[in-house]
Design a protein with these regions (language model features):
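Charged catalytic and DNA/RNA-contacting regions of genome-maintenance
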Residues: 1-178
């Protein structure tokens, strides 16, 4: 996961990249005073690692401390619109990003470009299987905050934080797809 604050401060660009499956998508989290929207997105996807621009303040980083996600600082230019757009268009062999639906979202492009560049620099294998970038709108799905996810025991049990007695583990035992 990569997070890129919008220059005007109205939203955060969020990119999620799974290098094992090639799934790659971006979304936006509207800015709010306590970062609840952003923290809900982090709780929703539970990434192993989250990269952020190196200039993000320590006060802001402290807000992420309860998420359990490893935060890694990455150089600021990777998140810039121009650099990120070049990284993405080069990787996808495309002249523009309009086909991906995110051309007009600089924060989303910044996050996606930084995530892809970070993967290119840290992985010793080809990333050719990452063949598309999807754009997801938060308004197209129901959002459950971290407290609701915990109380419903979707991915983690309330008793000890184990993964054994959860909705996800029960569905994982089914023999047929739903």
């Amino acid at each position: 996961m990569a997070l890129c604050p919008e220059a005007k401060g109205h939203a955060w660009g969020i990119a999620l990249l799974d290098i094992t499956t090639g799934e790659f998508f971006v979304t936006l989290a509207e800015h709010d005073q306590n970062l609840e929207n952003l923290l809900s997105e982090i709780a929703r996807y539970r990434p192993a690692e989250c990269i952020i621009p190196s200039t993000v303040s320590e006060a802001l980083i402290r807000k992420f401390s309860g998420t359990g996600v490893v935060l890694s600082r990455f150089r600021d230019e990777a998140f810039s619109y121009v650099h990120a757009r070049k990284t993405l268009t080069t990787h996808f062999h495309s002249a523009s990003l309009s086909a991906f639906g995110c051309e007009d979202e600089p924060a989303a492009i910044g996050a996606a470009g930084a995530a892809l560049l970070y993967a290119q620099e840290t992985q010793n294998s080809s990333l050719a299987h990452i063949s598309t970038l999807a754009t997801r709108a938060s308004s197209q799905s129901m959002m459950l905050d971290a407290v609701t996810l915990r109380n419903l025991e979707v991915k983690e049990s309330i008793r000890g934080g184990t993964k054994g007695a959860t909705l996800f583990s029960a569905l994982d035992l089914t023999k047929t797809p739903m």
